[in-house]
Curated annotation (Swiss-Prot):
The gene is HISN7. It catalyses: a myo-inositol phosphate + H2O = myo-inositol + phosphate; L-histidinol phosphate + H2O = L-histidinol + phosphate; beta-L-galactose 1-phosphate + H2O = L-galactose + phosphate. It comes from Arabidopsis thaliana. Its cofactor is Mg(2+). Mg(2+) 2 binds at residues 165, 168, 289. This is Bifunctional phosphatase IMPL2, chloroplastic. Pfam families: Inositol_P (PF00459).
Length: 346
């Protein structure tokens, strides 16, 4: 995955799918996902031609040593009505992305390697464009940062920024394994206030909003407690993605847990939020790989930070520099602290 837009050796025609209009201006619009009893529709349009420069950005972080209190997490400037509206748009984005992804899953299509040799497909590109079109039509003052095309905003910064990863786990998508997902985050003044993990093949959608309990297909969920590392189930996508130094740190945790597991991409975090695993530890993630996970994990009662225990914020600007980050997510603050102590990352 890349932190900024790149040119591909092959071009695709990007035409978002046609669908009914999203009633985004109506505050009473329900926030249920398409996988519960009510389906959200979304605005359709052809791909919008917006000049995209190679923008870069950075992350800053704030320390956190306590389990998040979901009753006090919403920014005071943001009303419940606004948050509900943004959640409705987020669900519409996931619907649009999922419609594209299901069209191409386990089908034959061209695969292009990016500059870092990570793969991209027409499904990645079309899914991102479908989401971008909805945001531009419903929330034109918001900025967008997508994995495939980077920063999209006429301004150099914005209070609201949507961070999109149309297919987190493209290799799993290519090989027909449904553990990939669409990641959608909304940041307000640098803080993730809304996050969605959508698995369009299994039709599972996790949505987290600061100040509210995380839901899976409309039902409240929560993480589980684990008293010590020796009883923990741990996920990471692949140990081959770690640098030598990071792999040594990871191995100190791996050697203490009950069961180390591999290969789930963003789905591992969804399983953690639902109370099926205890830890997820990964290295070298870009902002679009994990910002959507923050409200989902925290709203389910878990903790997610970098390897030093600092919480994630994104201070967006057109001239910021992108870097990679190490992420540890846990079902509760106790097992999270034990993982940090074992990582010994300074």
């Amino acid at each position: 995955m890349l932190a900024q837009s790149h040119f591909f050796s092959k071009s695709f025609d990007l035409i978002p799918p046609q669908s009914p209009a999203l009633r985004s201006a109506n505050p009473s619009l329900r926030i249920s996902s398409s996988y519960s009893n009510s389906r959200l529709s979304f605005l359709s349009s052809s791909a919008i031609a917006v000049p995209v420069s190679r923008r870069r950005f950075c992350l800053t972080m704030a320390s956190n040593s306590k389990r998040p209190n979901i009753s006090n997490e919403s920014p005071s400037e943001l009303s419940d009505t606004e948050l509900d509206r943004f959640a409705a748009v987020g669900n519409a984005l996931a619907d649009a992305s999922g419609e594209v992804i299901r069209k191409y899953f386990r089908k034959k299509f061209d695969i292009v390697d990016k500059d870092d040799m990570s793969p991209v497909t027409i499904a990645d590109q079309m899914a991102e464009e479908a989401m971008v079109s909805i945001i531009f039509q419903n929330l034109p003052s918001h900025a967008i940062y997508g994995e495939e095309k980077g920063w999209r905003c006429k301004e150099e910064s914005a209070d609201y920024v949507w961070v999109l990863d149309p297919i987190d786990g493209t290799k799993s998508f290519i090989t027909g394994k449904p553990v990939f997902g669409t990641l959608i985050a909304l940041l307000y003044k640098g803080k993730p206030i809304l996050g969605l993990i959508d698995q369009p093949i299994l039709k599972e959608r996790w949505i987290g909003m600061n100040g509210r309990r995380t839901k899976l297909n409309g039902e409240d969920i929560s993480t589980r407690s684990c008293p010590k590392l020796s009883q923990a189930y741990l996920y990471t996508t692949s140990p081959h993605l770690f640098s030598e130094e990071a792999e040594k740190a990871y191995s100190r945790v791996r050697d203490k847990v009950k069961v180390p597991l591999y290969g789930c991409d963003c789905y591992a975090y969804a399983l953690l939020a639902s109370g099926f695993v205890d830890l997820v530890i990964e290295s070298g993630l870009k902002p679009y790989d994990f910002l959507a996970l923050v409200p989902v994990i925290e709203g389910a009662g878990g903790t997610i930070t970098d390897w030093t225990g600092k919480r994630f914020l994104w201070e967006a600007s057109s001239s910021a520099v992108a870097t990679s980050f190490n992420v540890v997510a846990a079902g509760d603050s106790d097992i999270h602290q034990q993982a940090l102590e074992s990582l010994e990352w300074h």
